[in-house]
């Protein structure tokens, strides 16, 4: 039996980039397991290594090329997939590392498997029964990313994602719901809905009607959110483009059907800069919508991202952005100094902002937002809330509230936690806060 196990091909896997890339990795790993391959956590024990790359910004390209180089040095047999593989037909990778066995773009499961088969033939009689219904996941067992579409129809001038991942392709709604149901049945307590543009879900198929559990469902974000809310777990929406119909999901949040959490990348507040970015709306429209959202759902948490130092951004336009920030009072914010990305249309725009000015603006922006975030967190002191346990160590636990997405938001630290496990919901009382996180005490042993 031992000799048979040694003959089973083993594959190492490196996954870089965003949650959408993580889902691609999970799909590849699921197929590998279905075909009888084993996975290895070390380069030494692997017969071959797959590296799923990111190519969005220069630092991501550098990280991906470094990871490929490390895999080649430690193992020697490397297949590259992901967004970096789509750049210049894979030439960026091949020029840096000509020894790689194959290069593919993102969401290229058939091509990756073909390369694996060529360089490491699949074993006979794969034990497909070893595959759980929810597939192979790289996240903790109690939460999972649910990717509802690929690609994007927008052509934001700072972004090259459409050139790497293509135009919008929505997954059939019955497929999404079946995957969500399998995940929940496997013990997942939180579904994180992701795509390049979640609010555009179904646009490419004209909101086609599908069927789930014998009832019709439109391929549309609102209908999907409502149906996911029936599964009895936390449902969190990410990457929501600020279309008008986004307003329709806010009542679902107020009713407790989905989490009162919205991740909306506003990017800027200056109408001229937004136009140069080829982004919709303007700051006044966005501010009025934020006010309406909070009127309908007072507990809503708003996360957004912004770019400072975009080509041509004047001091007055930066001040306009800061005024928007003060007025909007967003809960969670990420800010990036504009970085030219090879192939992005914005590179051709005039009046680039000097690097030192970009960094000064980013630091100023984040100092203001940190104060806003700290003040909003401090308002939660003395309140009770349900949190989801992520980790337990001795008598302490780390959890997240409805306001906290994994990896990107804050945490809730619980001292003297009793009888709790990762993936459980418990009630806590907030006793103090800092600029990013909350500290709490456990209210009772009762778990929900």
Swiss-Prot record:
It catalyses: L-aspartate(89)-[ribosomal protein uS12]-hydrogen + (sulfur carrier)-SH + AH2 + 2 S-adenosyl-L-methionine = 3-methylsulfanyl-L-aspartate(89)-[ribosomal protein uS12]-hydrogen + (sulfur carrier)-H + 5'-deoxyadenosine + L-methionine + A + S-adenosyl-L-homocysteine + 2 H(+). [4Fe-4S] cluster 2 binds at residues 152, 156, 159. GO terms for biological process: tRNA modification. Pfam families: Radical_SAM, TRAM_2, UPF0004. Transmembrane segments: none annotated. One of its GO terms (molecular function) is 4 iron, 4 sulfur cluster binding. Keywords: 4Fe-4S, Cytoplasm, Iron, Iron-sulfur, Metal-binding, S-adenosyl-L-methionine, Transferase. Its cofactor is [4Fe-4S] cluster. [4Fe-4S] cluster 1 binds at residues 18, 54, 83. SUPFAM superfamilies: Radical SAM enzymes. Belongs to the methylthiotransferase family. RimO subfamily. This is Ribosomal protein uS12 methylthiotransferase RimO. It comes from Nitrosospira multiformis (strain ATCC 25196 / NCIMB 11849 / C 71). The gene is rimO.
